[in-house]
Regions:
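Surface-exposed binding/hinge segments that line
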Residues: 99, 134-179, 319
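N-terminal lobe/hinge region of extracytoplasmic solute-binding protein
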Residues: 35-91, 122, 192-196
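Aromatic- and charge-enriched surface segment that lines or borders ligand/interaction sites
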Residues: 85-130, 146, 152-154, 230, ...
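Bacterial signal peptide processing site
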Residues: 16-19
Length: 434
C-alpha cells in the first residue's frame, strides 16, 4: 500500500446535469452519452481508482449486495440485493454466509458460483497483485465455500463495517476467466471484462470513449437503456461544451460560472444533489527517489501539521466553488449518515503554523522570505490533473497561501492518466486529489 497523508479541502455540494428524461415504459431504450474529463484508465476492479472507472465497472460487475440510496452502511436492511439473494450471520457475528442467486450468470453464459466469491477475495488480498483493497479487507480472515452457491466470510473481530466490507467492497470476478492467469500478467493488463451486471462492455477507445450495452439476458431483467457511452474530453471546457452543444446528455461536474450559461440552453436542466466528492492535498510520505526512505519533507509529521494550519480551506472553497461546497470534516463524504460533523480538526492558524515551522528549523532567509533549513529551501512540487477545473483553480490559491508562509510551491499540471500514473508510482511530492 502507498503511504500518503491528506488535507481535505472541499466537499462538493454537487451538480448533476442532464437532458430532461421522459417517463413511463415508452421511455425505455436509447443511448445515454455522458461527457467526462478522464479516461477510466482500467476496467479491472482491483485497480480502479478514479470516478469514471468506478462508474463503468459497477455497471459491468456486481457486488454481493450494494449500499442503498440512503447511503446508510450501518443497517444491512438498507442494502440492495446484488449477486446474493440472501445472507445469514452466525450467533457470534464472526461469520457471514452469502447465498448466490442461482439465476445469476456471467456474460459468457457460465453460472456464477461461490467459488467466484472466494477467488475474488483471495485475488484482492494477494500482495503480489498490489491492488487497492488491503485496508478494506483487513478484518476479513478468509472466505470459504460450503456448497456451490454459499460463500462464508470469516471475520477477525466484530465491527460496524463488517457487512459493508464483505458485501459491497468487492465486485465479484469470474474465476473461470482469471484464476489460471499469473498475477504478474494481471498487473500488466487484465483480459476484457466478463461480468454479471446489467451492461456488458462493447468498446473501449482509450482516451476517447467507453461504450457499454445492455445485457439482454441478465438475471434481473434487461436494463432500461440500450447503451451508455462515456465521451472523454481531457479538458474541462471541452467536456462542458459537449453538453451544451447536444453532443452529450449528461455532465456531472458543472461549476458555478457554468450555471449562468444555462438560460441559453432550454434543452438542458440542472439538478442539484449532495455530492460524493471531496478534494484534498495529498502528501507523499515516501521519498520519490527511494521508496525505502521517508520523504525528505513530508516524512516529518510536525511539518505536515504546520502546512495544514497554514491553509485557509474556507477561503479556498469560497473562491473556487462559491456556495456550492463546504469545508469537509476530513477525508470523508458529508452525505453519509455516519459522518460526524463534530470531528476535531487542525484549525487554520497562520501564527501557530509559523511558530511550529520556526521550531523545526525552517526559518525565513533572504529578501524573498522563503524558509530554509541546513541550506535546503522549503519547497515542493504539487501535481494537478488537467481534468479538474476546480483543482486547477485551487492550485494557485493554495500556492499563494503557502508562499505567504515562506513555502515555495511549484505547480505542475498533468493529463489525468499521467497524473494518476505518477501517483501510483509514488513519483511526486504532493498532489491535489479528489
Amino acid at each position: 500500500m502507498r503511504k500518503l497523508a491528506v488535507i481535505a479541502l472541499a466537499f462538493f455540494a454537487g451538480g448533476c446535469t442532464e437532458h430532461a428524461p421522459g417517463a413511463g415504459p415508452a421511455d425505455a431504450g436509447g443511448t445515454l452519452v455522458i461527457s467526462t474529463t478522464a479516461d477510466p484508465g482500467t476496467l479491472f476492479p482491483p485497480f480502479v481508482i478514479n470516478v469514471q472507472a468506478k462508474q463503468i465497472t459497477e455497471q459491468i460487475y456486481d457486488y454481493l449486495a450494494d449500499v442503498g440510496p440512503d447511503l446508510d452502511t450501518r443497517n444491512e436492511k438498507g442494502f440492495r440485493l446484488g449477486l446474493s439473494d440472501r445472507w445469514r450471520w452466525s450467533g457470534d457475528s464472526l461469520t457471514l454466509a452469502f447465498h448466490v442467486n442461482p439465476r445469476a450468470k456471467w456474460h459468457d453464459g457460465r453460472d456464477v458460483t461461490a467459488r467466484d466469491v472466494q477467488f475474488t477475495f483471495a485475488l484482492n488480498k494477494n500482495p503480489a497483485l498490489g491492488g487497492r483493497m488491503g485496508t478494506e479487507l483487513a478484518n476479513i480472515d478468509s472466505v470459504t465455500v460450503t456448497d456451490s452457491l454459499t460463500a462464508v466470510f470469516w471475520f477477525r473481530a466484530r465491527s460496524p463495517t463488517q457487512f459493508l466490507d464483505a458485501a459491497a467492497q468487492l465486485l465479484i470476478l469470474p474465476a473461470h476467466q482469471l484464476e489460471k492467469i499469473p498475477v504478474d500478467s494481471l498487473r500488466e493488463g487484465a483480459p476484457p471484462p466478463i461480468g454479471t451486471g446489467r451492461f456488458r462492455l462493447r468498446k473501449w477507445d482509450k482516451g476517447a470513449s467507453v461504450e457499454i450495452i445492455a445485457d439482454t439476458s441478465n438475471f434481473r431483467g434487461r436494463a432500461r437503456l440500450d447503451r451508455v457511452i462515456w465521451s472523454v474530453a481531457p479538458e474541462f471546457t471541452t467536456a462542458v461544451t459537449r453538453l451544451f452543444s447536444g453532443d452529450a446528455d449528461l455532465f456531472d461536474a458543472l461549476r458555478p460560472e457554468n450555471l449562468q450559461q444555462l438560460a441559453r440552453y432550454r434543452n438542458v436542466r440542472t439538478i442539484l444533489l449532495p455530492g460524493m466528492d471531496y478534494a484534498f492535498l495529498r502528501f507523499n510520505l515516501r521519498d520519490p527517489m527511494n521508496r525505502a526512505r521517508p520523504h525528505p519533507l513530508f516524512g516529518d509529521r510536525d511539518l505536515r501539521r504546520a502546512i495544514t494550519m497554514a491553509v485557509n480551506r474556507g477561503t479556498l472553497v469560497r473562491s473556487v466553488l462559491d456556495t456550492f461546497a463546504l469545508v469537509p470534516v476530513g477525508p470523508i463524504v458529508r452525505a453519509y449518515p455516519t459522518t460526524d460533523p463534530r470531528g476535531a480538526q487542525l484549525p487554520f492558524d497562520s501564527a501557530r503554523a509559523s511558530r511550529l515551522l520556526d521550531s523545526l528549523g525552517w526559518v525565513r532567509r533572504g529578501v524573498d522570505g522563503m524558509r530554509a533549513k541546513n541550506g535546503r529551501e522549503l519547497a515542493f512540487t504539487l501535481i494537478i490533473p488537467t481534468s479538474s477545473m476546480n483543482r486547477i483553480r485551487m492550485g494557485p490559491l493554495l500556492q499563494e497561501q503557502l508562499r505567504r508562509m515562506g513555502i515555495r510551491v511549484q505547480l505542475e499540471q498533468l493529463e489525468a492518466s499521467t497524473e494518476g500514473d505518477r501517483e501510483a508510482r509514488g513519483a511526486f511530492d504532493a498532489a491535489l486529489g479528489g
